[in-house]
A protein has these predicted regions:
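Cytosolic, long alpha-helical scaffolding segments
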Residues: 1-198
């Protein structure tokens, strides 16, 4: 939700939406802290090695989710900066940012799985999107350098644009990490016979 909101703030900055995003981030951080506390206690108890590894995987997944939230906040803060300085991106730059945002939202949508059977194909699905994000990030960086060279944008806006692209690219990386974590957790649970082999 925060990833979507961060892009919406770039289109039109609204203080109430920005505050809601910040509150969401505080809740994400709260959940992450509680997950860390719970998993640390669970790992310290007498667990079979596979169980400890599975708990460790969920701990890493939680950390990746928290990092996605951080990148969404980064984008929102950049939107606030543009608003406060009355600066705007070109239509072309906004279209490119919109494409990066959509690709990231696609990854996050893929990660909303309802049962363990879906874990088996999640890495392949997310990997395709994440690879597309990397290629798109590269192409849009080239486009931006061209705009800068042709004096179609300011240096200040170019720096902010590049940081936003990087935030979206990192969101894709963390999304792939989560997909891989889900798959490994499923395999570990199968090994422990916590779920049926498919």
């Amino acid at each position: 939700d925060n990833v979507r909101k961060s892009f919406e703030l770039l289109i039109e900055f609204k203080e109430d939406k920005y505050e809601k995003l910040q509150k969401n981030e505080e809740y994400i951080n709260y959940l992450n802290k509680n997950i860390v506390d719970f998993t640390t206690n669970a790992i310290s108890t007498e667990f079979p090695i596979e169980g400890s590894q599975t708990i460790g995987l969920f701990l890493k997944i939680s950390a990746d989710i928290e990092r996605i939230g951080d990148h969404a906040v980064n984008i929102a803060q950049r939107a606030e900066l543009l608003q406060s300085e009355d600066r705007r991106f070109s239509h072309e730059a906004m279209d490119e940012i919109g494409i990066m945002s959509s690709l990231c939202v696609n990854i996050l949508d893929e990660l909303r799985i309802m049962n363990y059977d879906e874990f088996s194909s999640i890495v392949d699905k997310v990997d395709v999107i994440e690879e597309n994000i990397d290629k798109t990030h590269h192409q849009f960086t080239v486009n931006q350098l061209s705009r800068l060279k042709d004096k179609k944008c300011t240096t200040e806006n170019s720096v902010v644009y590049t940081k936003i692209l990087t935030d979206f690219e990192r969101i894709g990386d963390h999304g792939l990490n989560i997909a891989e974590g889900f798959y490994k957790a499923r395999e570990a649970m199968k090994a422990m016979k916590m779920i049926e082999h498919q």
